[in-house]
Design a protein with these regions (language model features):
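Conserved segment of winged-helix/HTH DNA-binding domains
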Residues: 77-78
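Residues in the helix-turn-helix
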Residues: 50
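Extreme N-terminal segment that seeds HTH/winged-HTH DNA-binding domains in transcriptional regulators
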Residues: 1-46, 60, 65
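Short, hydrophobic-biased segments on the C-terminal half of alpha helices
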Residues: 55-56
Length: 78
């Protein structure tokens, strides 16, 4: 999936939808570490601030869990 920079939908929301879809379709499995903010920034050519906002929202929704010094991991989809 690609981000549409011309869309009226915010980039962080588009990224959230992409990551959720990857969790649901098995690209990222429960307990698996997702790419770092820097890696995601390069993959999607968007700022780390945008990446961080999407990740924080997904953590609040229970899709991801950040572990200090280790990374961000997939939680069981609720």
């Amino acid at each position: 999936m690609k981000l549409d920079k011309e869309s009226t939908v915010s980039l962080y929301i588009q990224l959230m939808h992409i990551i959720k879809e990857q969790i649901h379709n098995g690209t990222y499995l429960e307990g698996e570490q997702i790419p770092t903010e820097g890696e995601l920034s390069k993959m999607y050519n968007i700022s780390r601030i945008t990446i961080r906002r999407a990740i924080e929202e997904l953590c609040q929704q229970g899709y991801l869990k950040k572990i200090q010094g280790k990374g961000t991991f997939v939680e069981a989809p609720k």
